[in-house]
Curated annotation (Swiss-Prot):
Protein purpose: RuBisCO catalyzes two reactions: the carboxylation of D-ribulose 1,5-bisphosphate, the primary event in carbon dioxide fixation, as well as the oxidative fragmentation of the pentose substrate in the photorespiration process. Both reactions occur simultaneously and in competition at the same active site.
This protein's name: Ribulose bisphosphate carboxylase large chain
GO biological process annotation, one example: reductive pentose-phosphate cycle
Gene from which this protein is expressed: rbcL
InterPro entries per record: RuBisCO (IPR033966), RuBisCo_large_chain_AS (IPR020878), RuBisCO_lsu_C (IPR000685), RuBisCO_lsu_C_sf (IPR036376), RuBisCO_lsu_fd_N (IPR017443), RuBisCO_lsu_N_sf (IPR036422), RuBisCO_lsuI (IPR020888)
């Protein structure tokens, strides 16, 4: 008979294909699916595959004008989640042709743009993505990466030290610059604009940029070390963001900063390209990430946002502390830290890594540990994050009873002591408190910091368990 077979049919008839052999060029996704009661997992998984690729709720006439088998997403495997009766992991393969080259924005619009409001699902979380080599190669990635950054800064064999300037809102530009100078002079490598410092009435961006540049050049001259301040270029429009980045380059400073989730991937990728072309390092803050990644059964896991940032571009990204005031579990955190830094990462479910990822020499990103950490955490931080990281102590520097510069001295002495102890073969984690106590005997600044924050115990339940 003429015409086509109209009507609504089960997604699983077309989009659930357990025999499918995944291709090297497919983008693979692992979704944690919580179907509504009565919806079988195969149908729920197929619905996700359909709605995030070629499907719609009914058969349409124009399906006949395309090759569905070439373009459809496929749910190729479903597994139950241990200990969760209502949850499943659905694996979906997407043909590469569904995505625009070099666009993280398009990748997310396709994969997570529509399906999360789907009625057949009670909840949905994107746990991991496997980015195929063919797609990775369409991205510039980080402007410089870990090795180039070390070479630019001439700093090797240890983590880098930073500090967020507080109070985050309300300082004048000149006082802000003074705080920057004191921290850098004391021994930090970097200071940082807070993520919500953009250009407000009490401190316009241009004034801040000037005073911070003056501060870092003065500190550089006094210490003989290269210094940086993350100048936050985040703005209300891309044009304004670029104006700020260009001014930073004209000042000759080494690094700018961007809030990549609130600013958006399009703006971030634009800025990353500018930074590579103009020799600026790019520090990335993840403001708003917990809105997306904190729920265990719905949203997007941070490891996906981290992979997306490596593609879009950034040289540093905040990644939790494992020990401070913000949530984050050790194995999970180390999983996405490796995804940020390493070139090839094996599948390892115990660390939340669902797929083997090959970055084919895309530069790496330095993880930034920031939030509620102080000198007593230093041994654990050096042990957990290793050399290729940035450790940021905001309150842990500025809260020092003698002021910012002594606070910076305390952190630098603690770091150097931990690195030396490790290089001598001592177990920084086990002997941590002892290492810090020894160093504080010859550093009054460190002794004062130790007194304020006292020794710590690592005993609390993390929320993000597998």
């Amino acid at each position: 008979s003429a015409g086509f077979k109209a009507g609504v049919k089960d997604y699983k008839l077309t989009y659930y294909t357990p025999d499918y052999e995944t291709k090297d060029t497919d983008i693979l996704a692992a979704f944690r699916v919580t179907p509504q009661p009565g919806v079988p997992p195969e149908e729920a998984g197929a619905a996700v595959a359909a709605e995030s690729s070629t499907g719609t709720w009914t058969t349409v006439w124009t399906d006949g004008l395309t090759n569905l088998d070439r373009y459809k997403g496929r749910c190729y495997h479903i597994e139950p989640v241990a200990g969760e009766e209502t949850q499943f992991i659905a694996y979906v393969a997407y043909p590469l042709d569904l995505f625009e080259e070099g666009s993280v924005t398009n990748m997310f619009t396709s994969i997570v743009g529509n399906v999360f409001g789907f009625k057949a699902l009670r909840a949905l979380r994107l746990e991991d993505l496997r980015i195929p080599v063919a797609y990775v190669k369409t991205f510039q990635g980080p402007p410089h990466g870990i090795q180039v950054e070390r070479d630019k800064l001439n700093k090797y064999g240890r983590p880098l030290l930073g500090c967020t300037i507080k109070p985050k809102l309300g300082l004048s530009a000149k006082n802000y610059g003074r705080a920057v100078y004191e921290c850098l002079r004391g021994g930090l490598d970097f200071t940082k604009d807070d993520e919500n410092v953009n250009s407000q009435p009490f401190m316009r961006w241009r004034d801040r940029f000037l005073f911070c540049a003056e501060a870092l050049y003065k500190a550089q001259a006094e210490t003989g070390e290269i210094k940086g301040h993350y100048l936050n270029a985040t703005a209300g429009t891309c044009e304004e963001m670029m104006k700020r980045a260009i001014f930073a380059r004209e000042l000759g400073v080494p690094i700018v900063m961007h809030d990549y989730l609130t600013g958006g991937f399009t703006a971030n990728t634009t800025l990353a390209h500018y930074c590579r072309d103009n020799g600026l390092l790019l520090h990335i803050h993840r403001a708003m990430h917990a809105v997306i990644d904190r729920q265990k059964n719905h949203g997007i896991h941070f490891r996906v946002l981290a992979k997306a940032l490596r593609m879009s571009g950034g040289d540093h990204i905040h990644s939790g502390t494992v020990v401070g005031k913000l949530e984050g579990e050790r194995e999970i955190t180390l999983g996405f830290v490796d995804l940020l830094r390493d070139d090839f990462i094996e599948k390892d479910r115990s660390r939340g890594i669902y797929f083997t990822q090959d970055w084919v020499s895309l530069p790496g990103v330095l993880p930034v540990a920031s939030g509620g950490i102080h000198v007593w955490h230093m041994p654990a931080l050096t042990e957990i994050f290793g050399d290729d990281s940035v450790l940021q102590f905001g309150g842990g520097t500025l809260g020092h009873p003698w002021g910012n510069a002594p606070g910076a001295v305390a952190n630098r002495v603690a770091l150097e002591a931990c690195v030396q102890a490790r290089n001598e073969g001592r177990x920084x984690a086990r002997e941590g408190n002892e290492i810090i106590r020894e160093a504080s005997k010859w550093s009054p600044e460190l002794a004062a910091a130790c007194e304020v924050w006292k020794e710590i115990k690592f005993e609390f339940e993390a929320m993000d368990t597998l």
